[in-house]
C-alpha cells in the first residue's frame, strides 16, 4: 500500500468533466472536503497529504480527500488554462459523486488555491475555507521580501528536467519540510515507485500549460469563514503570502506553525487537526 495510497476500503473514483477523478472517502457525519497539496508530479496524493489527520477528522465527519490532476491518480489530463481550474472541477466532481451539495473545504498548497478558486466560481458549494501554504492566484502573487523563484520551485524545476533522478527527487522533497529527517528512504522509494507506475500523468503534466490568472482583486468577494494555516519555514510559498491573504479577506484568521515547512498536515498533523476542528466548531460548519 505504501505512504501514497489509502487502504482499498477508502479509495474511490468517479468521472468528472475532464476525466477520471480519484479521492479518499472515510468517516460518517457532516461532510468535509480536503484537497491535496502540490509536490512531486506525479507523486503527491491526498492520502500522503492528509493521512495524519483523516482518522481524527473522520471521527465525526464524512471526509472526502481529492487528488489533484496529474499529481495523484486523478487524470491524466493535458490542459491549457489556469491549473487550479481543472483542479476545482475535479473537487466538484468528487462532491457530486458523494452527493455533497456544499461543505467546508480544507486545502494546503495547491489544494488551498484550488479551494479559493472553487469558492469564487461556485460560492454556494463552499461553506468555509481552511487554506495556507498557498498563493491566492494561479502563477503566484508578488513577494515583498522573499526571493523568487523559491527554493522549492527551483528544486521542482530540477526534478522536471531529470524526472528519473532519485537525488533530484530527494532534494526536492527536503525543501518541503522544516525537518529534513521527514524525507525518509520509504518516502523517496514510494514516491519513485508511484512516478514509475504513472508515466502518463508525468507526460500529461509536462505537456500542460498553466495560464497565469490573478485572484487578488476577487478575494474580498469571499464571505464565508476562513482560516489560514501556514508553516513558518515554508520554502515554497513564503509566510508573507499567508499574511497577504489574511489581509485581503477581513474575516480570515491566520495561524503560523513554527518548525513547519510547506506541508503542515504532514509535518504538524496534531496542530493542523486542532486548528481545523476548532475552526469548524467555532463557526458551526
Descriptions of predicted regions:
Residues 19-73:
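Conserved HGGG/HGGXW glycine-rich cap/lid loop of the alpha/beta-hydrolase fold
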Residues 116, 120, 127-161:
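Flexible "cap/lid" loop of the alpha/beta hydrolase fold
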Residues 162-220:
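Conserved alpha/beta-hydrolase catalytic His-Asp/Glu region
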Residues 222, 228-230, 234:
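Short beta-strand/loop motif that positions the catalytic acidic residue
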Residues 251-285:
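Catalytic active-site module of serine/aspartate enzymes centered on a nucleophile-bearing elbow/loop
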Residues 52-55, 64-106, 274:
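Active-site loop/oxyanion-hole signature of alpha/beta-hydrolase fold enzymes
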Residues 107, 111, 115:
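Gly/Ala-rich beta-loop-alpha elbow adjacent to hydrolase catalytic centers
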Residues 235-241:
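Conserved alpha/beta-hydrolase "acid-adjacent" motif
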Amino acid at each position: 500500500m505504501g505512504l501514497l495510497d489509502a487502504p482499498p476500503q477508502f479509495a474511490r473514483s468517479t468521472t468528472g468533466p475532464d476525466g477520471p477523478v480519484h479521492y479518499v472517502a472515510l468517516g460518517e457525519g457532516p461532510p468535509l472536503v480536503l484537497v491535496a497539496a502540490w509536490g512531486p508530479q506525479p507523486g503527491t496524493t491526498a492520502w500522503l497529504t492528509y493521512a495524519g489527520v483523516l482518522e481524527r477528522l473522520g471521527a465525526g465527519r464524512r471526509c472526502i480527500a481529492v487528488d489533484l490532476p496529474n499529481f495523484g491518480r486523478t487524470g491524466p489530463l493535458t490542459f491549457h488554462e489556469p491549473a487550479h481550474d481543472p483542479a476545482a472541477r475535479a473537487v466538484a466532481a468528487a462532491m457530486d459523486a458523494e452527493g455533497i451539495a456544499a461543505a467546508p473545504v480544507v486545502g494546503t498548497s495547491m489544494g488551498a488555491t484550488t479551494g479559493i478558486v472553487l469558492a469564487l466560481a461556485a460560492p454556494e458549494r463552499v461553506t468555509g475555507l481552511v487554506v495556507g501554504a498557498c498563493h491566492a492566484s494561479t502563477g503566484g502573487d508578488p513577494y515583498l521580501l522573499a526571493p523568487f523563484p523559491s527554493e522549492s520551485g527551483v528544486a521542482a524545476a530540477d526534478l522536471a528536467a531529470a524526472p528519473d533522478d532519485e537525488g533530484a527527487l530527494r532534494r526536492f522533497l527536503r525543501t518541503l519540510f522544516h525537518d529534513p529527517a521527514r524525507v525518509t528512504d520509504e518516502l523517496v522509494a514510494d514516491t519513485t515507485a508511484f512516478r514509475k507506475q504513472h508515466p502518463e500523468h508525468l507526460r500529461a503534466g509536462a505537456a500542460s500549460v498553466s495560464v497565469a490568472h490573478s485572484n487578488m482583486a476577487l478575494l474580498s468577494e469571499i464571505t464565508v469563514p476562513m482560516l489560514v494555516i501556514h508553516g513558518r519555514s515554508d520554502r515554497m510559498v513564503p509566510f508573507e503570502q499567508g499574511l497577504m491573504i489574511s489581509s485581503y479577506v477581513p474575516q480570515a484568521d491566520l495561524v503560523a506553525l513554527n518548525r513547519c515547512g510547506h506541508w503542515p498536515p504532514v509535518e504538524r498533523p496534531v496542530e493542523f487537526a486542532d486548528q481545523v476542528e476548532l475552526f469548524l466548531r467555532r463557526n458551526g460548519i
